């Protein structure tokens, strides 16, 4: 597995923060690094496989990656993101207690992926741009300024994350996308889902298509197929059982959709013919 080292990304040995844009981010194999990062998705779509679990990412997705996490990008489509790198929560010169603002693992679950709305994303861009402008300065005032901006970024993300920001339809759509990540195997009635998140069905279709490039049902099918591919690689369950566990009532229909999406059959994936290294 590829290991990315801080010496290749931070401007100096005592720099606590670095900005690494990926405009665009192409498919990239599984890797980890000896630093932490906050991945901010500007626009486009892709699949982010984080510690073996696939997540669909779009504009407004924010991912918190620790130094022991492994991840990769695939099925990217005009995916543009900015990585805010930092060595460790306790490796800042002027800041302490940052862990309290970062996602915390509870009962083995790490809430790695957050979502923010478009207006917050604009504010995030401004903070990141200010950090980037000062990146080459190594004096103490510049270091302190960058760290203050980093703290402001964390505060903005925490205050604006889905759980606390439901005042407009874009935020409610983000919450709906997060809900689908947890309920992808359920039978989804789009009228009921639209009501649940206080969206009209027309608004749901329009905004989801704008955000992901897919219709709601196409998005749900892709999400189910990604989860199924993960189970094919990492479980001993039969193809039929996996199809049912991922929301498909007909295993033959599942196999047809799977091949159409990945150009491999479920059996091919199970046997590792796609070249994936487990």
Curated annotation (Swiss-Prot):
Keywords in alphabetical order: Activator, Cytoplasm, DNA-binding, Repeat, Rhamnose metabolism, Transcription, Transcription regulation
Primary subcellular site in the record, as a coarse category: cytoplasm
GO MF term list: DNA-binding transcription factor activity; sequence-specific DNA binding
Pfam families per the UniProt record, alphabetical: AraC_binding, HTH_18
A single Gene Ontology CC term: cytoplasm
Database matches in SUPFAM superfamilies: Homeodomain-like (SSF46689), Regulatory protein AraC (SSF51215)
Site (Interaction with sigma-70): 241, 250
Gene3D superfamilies: Homeodomain-like, Jelly Rolls
Positions of the DNA-binding region: 191-212, 239-262
Residues covered by the HTH araC/xylS-type domain: 174-272
UniProt-listed SMART domains: HTH_ARAC
Cell compartments where the protein resides: Cytoplasm
One GO biological process term: positive regulation of DNA-templated transcription
Oligomeric and partner information: Binds DNA as a dimer.
Reported function: Activates expression of the rhaBAD and rhaT operons.
This protein's name: HTH-type transcriptional activator RhaS
Species of the source: Escherichia coli O1:K1 / APEC
């Amino acid at each position: 597995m590829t290991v990315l080292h801080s010496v290749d990304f931070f401007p100096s040995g005592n720099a606590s923060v670095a900005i690494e844009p990926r405009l665009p981010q192409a498919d990239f194999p599984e890797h980890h690094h000896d630093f932490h990062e906050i991945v901010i998705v500007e626009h486009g779509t892709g699949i982010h496989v984080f510690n073996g679990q696939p997540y669909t990412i779009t504009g407004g997705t924010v991912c918190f990656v620790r130094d022991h996490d492994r991840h990769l990008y695939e099925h990217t489509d005009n995916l543009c993101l900015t990585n805010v790198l930092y060595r460790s929560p306790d490796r800042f010169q002027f800041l302490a207690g940052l862990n309290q603002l970062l996602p915390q693992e509870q009962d083995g679950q790490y809430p790695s992926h957050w979502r923010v709305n478009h207006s917050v994303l604009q504010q995030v861009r401004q903070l990141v741009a200010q950090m980037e402008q000062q990146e080459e300065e190594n004096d103490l005032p510049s270091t302190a300024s960058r760290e203050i901006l980093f703290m402001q970024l964390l505060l903005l993300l925490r205050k604006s994350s889905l759980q606390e920001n439901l005042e407009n339809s874009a935020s409610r759509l983000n919450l709906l996308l997060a809900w689908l990540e947890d309920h992808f195997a359920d039978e989804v009635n789009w009228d009921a889902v639209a009501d649940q998140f206080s969206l009209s069905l027309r608004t749901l279709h329009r905004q989801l298509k704008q955000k992901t490039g897919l219709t709601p049902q196409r998005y749900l099918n892709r999400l189910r197929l990604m989860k199924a591919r993960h189970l094919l690689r990492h479980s001993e369950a039969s193809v039929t059982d996996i199809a049912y566990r991922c929301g498909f009532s007909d295993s033959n229909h599942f196999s047809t959709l799977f091949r159409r999406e990945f150009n491999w059959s479920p059996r091919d994936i199970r046997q590792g013919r796609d070249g994936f290294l487990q």
